[in-house]
Structure formats: structure tokens, C-alpha cells
């Protein structure tokens, strides 16, 4: 599992494209999918926080918070863009941030309201994907996928962006994060 900063250092243009789509409306906006206790999916809109030190989310007392506390697996998808059908997707594990100084610093920096029962989670990244669609919506989207270097699920060289469905990885960062 890679932190946001490790992911961004490995593939900066892909990370910039993900950041652009998550923050296209100003603050971070996305759909967070978690795993319910019965194994089914749960999806909620959230405001992820992208900081140099990581990808975070302040989560209030809710079913999704209990999902993350019980089973940290998540998927995060960007809100639909107004000018295009471009999309970003991240998946990995969320972990509760327990360092009080770190929680306080991020809460102050990102204006978290203190009188609400929230917890701060950091999202590690196992998979990142960005898809760019042509304006007419006719051609297949240009898709790039990044797999965390320790992830054995991918073929070729994990950690390098590749087009989904290709047999060998291709380092083509320019098409998805331009």
C-alpha cells in the first residue's frame, strides 16, 4: 500500500490528473465506496483532503465510518466533470489516524468543525486509474492504471502506469494527465 505522496512521487503526472478531477470544484469531492458488514457495497459522497503528506477524509459517525473502522477497504471515484466525462478512481485501505498532533494540524488546515463527531482516516493507494474521454464520446477512453509496486495482481512491472487491457505496461503519462 502506497501513501498519496509515494504514489505522486512514482507517477506525478497521473497523480496531478487524479488531483485535478478530485478538486475540480474547489474542495475535494468524490464518491466513497466501503464494504458493509454483510459484504455488500456502500457508496456515499465525501470531501477527500489531498495534502502533501497524504490523502485523508474526515468521516462523521455514520455507517460508512463503521465500515472503515471494521474493514478499511475503500474505493474513491471522482465526481463527474462538467466539461467532459473524464474520471479518476483510487482503491486501497483506509486507516484511522491516531496521532493527535497530526489530526489537529490537518483539522486546522482544512477547517474541520470540532463540535462534530468525526474521525480522520488516511487512504493508502493500491490502485489508481484515470480515464480521459474524447469530446464526442465516440472513441474508447484513454485509460491509465497504476498498481502499487507490491501489488502482484498486475502483469508486467507494477508501479508503472499502463493502459487497461494491454499485455505489457506502457508508460504513457501524457495522455491521461495533460
Language model features: what each stretch is:
Residues 22-36, 74-77:
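A short, Trp-centered hydrophobic/proline-enriched beta-strand micro-motif
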Residues 48-83:
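A short mixed-secondary-structure module that forms the rim of ligand-binding clefts
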Residues 2-30:
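Short, basic/aromatic recognition patches
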Residues 1-13, 84-178:
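Charged, gly/pro-rich active-site loop segments
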Amino acid at each position: 500500500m502506497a501513501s498519496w505522496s509515494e504514489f505522486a512521487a512514482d507517477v506525478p503526472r497521473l497523480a496531478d490528473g487524479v488531483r485535478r478531477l478530485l478538486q475540480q470544484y474547489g474542495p475535494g469531492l468524490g464518491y466513497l465506496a466501503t464494504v458493509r458488514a454483510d459484504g455488500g457495497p456502500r457508496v456515499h459522497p465525501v470531501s477527500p483532503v489531498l495534502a502533501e503528506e497524504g490523502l485523508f477524509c474526515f468521516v462523521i459517525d455514520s455507517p460508512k465510518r463503521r465500515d472503515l473502522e471494521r474493514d478499511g477497504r475503500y474505493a474513491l471515484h471522482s465526481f463527474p466533470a462538467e466539461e467532459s466525462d473524464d474520471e479518476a478512481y483510487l482503491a486501497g485501505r483506509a486507516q484511522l489516524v491516531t496521532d493527535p498532533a497530526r489530526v489537529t494540524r490537518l483539522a486546522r488546515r482544512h477547517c474541520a468543525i470540532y463540535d462534530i463527531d468525526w474521525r480522520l482516516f488516511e487512504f493508502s493507494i493500491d490502485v489508481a486509474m484515470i480515464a480521459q474521454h474524447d469530446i464526442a464520446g465516440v472513441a474508447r477512453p484513454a485509460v491509465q492504471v497504476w498498481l502499487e509496486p507490491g501489488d502482484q495482481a498486475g502483469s508486467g512491472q507494477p508501479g508503472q502506469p499502463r493502459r487497461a487491457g494491454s499485455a505489457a505496461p506502457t508508460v504513457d503519462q501524457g495522455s491521461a494527465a495533460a
